[in-house]
Amino acid sequence: MVWHSGSTPDSHAEIFILNETGWGVVVLTNKNHVLEEASLPEFKKGIINILNGEEPVDIPKNIPIVQIVMSILIFALFITAIVLIIKYKRKKICKKMTWIFLGSLFLILSITLIPLLIYSTNSPWQTIKIFSADVALLISIIVTLLNVNGLISIYIALKSELVNKS
């Protein structure tokens, strides 16, 4: 079998030729989601089985692990924001430097998250937003919540100095 595969940020192409049967197949797909590319080899095996007169293989179910983990992270960040607000309202304030460190950490994470995603997927943010809209939305929510948590933490640090002085 002769086989070639190629991908761009928004499309995927495969060509394979089955020498023993004389069949050749070109599969052009519009990758609507970067994370779904893992199922394409199974798709190819199914086509080969059909051409050989066999039953196609079952493509494994795509469990959206990334989306589930990101949703759990969003929930945790949302709860963290609520806890920070409650701590501020109840005046249960720790050392100022702890809050500044925590706030800075949240802000640094929010600033670096999208560039890290762009670097790790080797795709521009616009492409991620178009072809992985669910991941882009979840990342945007995470960045927003990281910013909110960072700003709340720094606000608590600035107000804690005033509370400790009075």
Each language-model region and where it sits:
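Catalytic loop of the DD-peptidase/beta-lactamase superfamily, centered on the K-T-G motif
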Residues: 1-166
